[in-house]
From Swiss-Prot:
Biased composition (Polar residues): 352-394
Signal peptide: none
Name the UniProt record assigns to this protein: Gag polyprotein
Biological process, per Gene Ontology: microtubule-dependent intracellular transport of viral material towards nucleus; symbiont entry into host cell; viral release from host cell
Site feature Cleavage, where: 182-183, 210-211, 223-224, 488-489
Compositional bias per record (Gly residues), positions renumbered to this chain: 463-483
Claim: RNA-binding is one of the keywords in the record: yes
Organism: Feline foamy virus
Post-translational modification: Specific enzymatic cleavages in vivo by viral protease yield mature proteins. The protease is not cleaved off from Pol. Since cleavage efficiency is not optimal for all sites, intermediary molecules are expressed.
Length: 514
């Protein structure tokens, strides 16, 4: 019984194989499957096309029949294609069964002139014997393995024995003299926040001991130095240069520096490590933003003259990249010219000169008294004592009241104190103008004169530090004896002292009679 055939798909297969798309009735087609569910390798089938019935009338549904026999490539039409594509034209077609599925090699004989048969070489007797020996050896090995498995199962199987210790991997690159480096630059700081600046200070020493030529070696050196801080380990990309490595260590320890905090961060770095390290880290933090970093660094330079000189040199350069490259040279030259170190401090020795102690030309009366003799603690119980000639300048400030302003000496050659004498507030029942030694008050506390008389006695008005009413708090009753009016009388010269003493005695007697 003929099987169903799809003429349109069959014509497409003819076209794909370079044939005329005109299949005829009774054509024998050798179908080659180039792949399928059996795996790699070709499989073959042989079919006959049925387009008419026995009377010569066309069939309503074209079909095909399986054709037995070995494929003859000289006479049969060859069509090749994938398994699924061929089954769309020949419905339910499968490779032939038996030796015919191998196509031209089904009978094991060569066909001269056939392209597929030219490279075929049948197996020899020697090869057959060798294959038999290989199969026998494999069977013996399988038998031995089964016996070993039975013995293990009978005796019990324990835990697997650990393998041998792996041999250490060969060293990649040169050996790092880590002990020598530590003896030169010291041990790693215990605080991770100090590692970045410590490494920045040690880069020159590291290069002097162990020159580094590539970033892989730099990465190995840094990781060996910071082995006590596993969180600071660098990768190969982070160790492209020393600046990049230091910046990466800073970010790992401190976090990314925000733009609004960059000025404070660079200021702290400048105080610890100098302006060069602050500039390098600033360029790393900002990805080479010259304008931002220079705007911060210029505020850290010592002096406006240095900033102006550096700015004038940078203005002559072409671009920001050239300015950043020449920044260390410009700053080093300026610091060297000014005699400054990396912190902007003078490296010249300081000459300490002792200032000359010069006596003021016109020292005040209060200053002379403080230099000669300390102030007494209590003057309420002191009696009047005429000053001696050698103490006329030193005793004057001792007798003045603590609340009164300092006054210049009168009648002596000690000079005049030009310090202003403000008016004191009204207190202790004194007159409205306050205690003013250059005003004379009459009865009732009203001023009678606007200046001191040429020769005042103790009874004509108040003296500096005294009371205009002849007495003060803690000095006895107001209507007491005459001694109370003469206790706080102070004279600036010997003549005035003598005259004032006589007048004070007379005034005391009159006060007692009244």
């Amino acid at each position: 019984m003929a099987r169903e055939l799809n003429p349109l798909q069959l014509q497409q297969l003819y076209i794909n194989n370079g044939l005329q798309p005109n299949p005829g009735h009774g054509d024998i087609i050798a179908v080659r499957f180039t792949g399928g569910p059996w795996g790699p390798g070709d499989r073959w089938a042989r079919v006959t096309i049925r387009l008419q019935d026995n009377t010569g009338q066309p069939l309503q549904v074209p079909g095909y029949d399986l054709e037995p026999g070995i494929i003859n490539l000289r006479e049969d039409i060859l069509i090749a294609g994938p398994y699924n594509l061929i089954r769309t034209a020949f419905l339910d077609l499968e490779p032939a069964r038996g030796p015919e599925r191998h196509g031209p090699f089904g009978d094991g004989r060569l066909q001269p002139g056939d392209g597929l048969s030219e490279g075929f070489q049948p197996i020899t007797d020697e090869e057959i014997q060798a294959e038999v020996g290989t199969i026998g050896a494999a069977r013996n090995e399988i038998r031995l393995l089964r016996e070993a498995l039975q013995r293990l199962q009978a005796g019990g199987v324990g835990r697997p024995i650990p393998g041998a210790v792996l041999q250490p991997q060969p060293v990649i690159g040169p050996v790092i003299p880590i002990n020598h480096l530590r003896s030169v630059i010291g041990n790693t700081p215990p605080n991770p926040r100090d590692v970045a600046l410590w490494l920045g200070r040690s880069t020159a020493a590291i290069e002097g001991v162990f020159p580094i030529v590539d970033q892989v070696t730099r990465m190995r050196v840094v990781n060996a130095l910071v082995a006590s801080h596993p969180g600071l380990t660098l990768t190969e990309n982070e160790a492209g240069s020393w600046n990049a490595a230091i910046s990466a260590l800073w970010r790992k320890a401190h976090g990314a520096a925000a733009q609004h905090e960059l000025a404070g961060v660079l200021s702290d770095i400048n105080k610890k490590e100098g302006i060069q390290t602050a500039f390098n880290l600033g360029m790393q933090f900002t990805d080479g933003n010259w304008s931002l970093v220079w705007g911060i660094i210029r505020t850290l330079l010592p002096g406006q003259a240095l900033v102006t000189n550096a700015q004038s040199q940078f203005d002559l350069m072409g671009d920001d990249i050239q300015r950043a490259e020449n920044f260390p040279r410009v700053i080093n030259n300026l610091y060297t010219m000014l005699g400054l170190n990396i912190h902007g401090q003078s490296i010249r020795p300081r000459v300490q000169t002792q200032p000359l102690q010069t006596r003021p030309r016109n020292p005040g009366r209060s200053q002379q008294g403080q230099l000669n003799q300390p102030r007494p603690q209590n003057r309420a119980n002191q009696s009047y004592r005429p000053p001696r000639q050698q103490q006329q300048h030193s005793d004057v400030p001792e007798q003045r009241d603590q609340r009164g302003p300092s006054q210049p000496p009168r009648g002596s050659g000690g000079g005049y104190n030009f310090r202003r004498n403000p008016q004191q507030p009204q207190r202790y029942g004194q007159g409205p103008p306050g205690p003013n030694p250059y005003r004379r008050f009459g009865d009732g506390g009203n001023p009678q004169q606007q200046g001191p008389p040429p020769n005042r006695g103790p009874d004509q008005g108040p003296r500096p530090g005294g009371n205009p009413r002849g007495g003060g708090r803690g000095q006895g009753p107001r209507n007491g004896g005459g001694s109370a009016a003469a206790v706080h009388t102070v004279k600036a010269s010997e003549n005035e002292t003598k005259n004032g003493s006589a007048e004070a005695v007379d005034g005391g007697k009159k006060g007692g009679k009244d």
